[in-house]
């Protein structure tokens, strides 16, 4: 396989901007955001993702990209959670296994922001989305959410299941 020796993020950015100048499709803006993100230009990436999210190309993935970028920019947690809410809202309902990782990501965000009950709901939705095909770590994380939410019996049940799967 032949690789391009002179290919860089800057070259890719220049090319995608030229393409957007010819035909300003949202897919080019998404790609520009991804390149800027890879270059760690998070402010530029966020601006691109926000344009995509205001277009007909808005998707769970584009809102997720915006949420992760805002998180890296140390934005207020409420803003990041709002973007993750939009991410999950753009998933097919009921959420399928392909989109289930977004639920785990939001559950972790909820846990980091003392919203254990909301985290439990996302863990439960994840469990449903993957038809119960989960591992010991899942049960441990859901147990932690249940414990913080003062759902002690659920917490006990989940930690027992985690230990069963990984003694």
Report residues per predicted region.
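Short coil turns that delineate tetratricopeptide repeat
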Residues: 23-24, 57, 92, 97, ...
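Register position in tetratricopeptide repeats
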Residues: 5, 38, 72-73, 112, ...
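TPR-repeat structural position
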Residues: 9, 42, 76-77, 116, ...
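Start-of-helix register in tetratricopeptide repeats
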Residues: 25-28, 61, 97, 101, ...
């Amino acid at each position: 396989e032949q690789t391009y020796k002179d290919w860089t993020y800057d070259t890719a950015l220049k090319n995608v901007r030229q393409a957007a100048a010819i035909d300003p499709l949202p897919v080019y803006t998404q790609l520009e955001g991804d390149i800027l993100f890879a270059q760690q230009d998070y402010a530029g990436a966020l601006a691109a993702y926000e344009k995509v999210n205001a277009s007909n190309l808005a998707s769970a993935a584009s809102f997720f990209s915006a949420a992760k970028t805002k998180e890296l920019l140390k934005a207020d947690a409420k803003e990041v959670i709002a973007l993750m809410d939009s991410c999950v809202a753009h998933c097919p309902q009921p959420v399928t296994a392909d989109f289930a990782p977004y639920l785990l990501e939001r559950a972790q965000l909820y846990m980091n922001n003392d919203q254990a009950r909301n985290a439990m709901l996302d863990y439960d939705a994840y469990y449903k989305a993957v038809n119960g095909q989960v591992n010991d770590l899942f049960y441990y994380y859901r147990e932690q959410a249940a414990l913080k939410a003062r759902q002690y019996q659920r917490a006990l049940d989940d930690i027992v299941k985690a230990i069963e799967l990984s003694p």
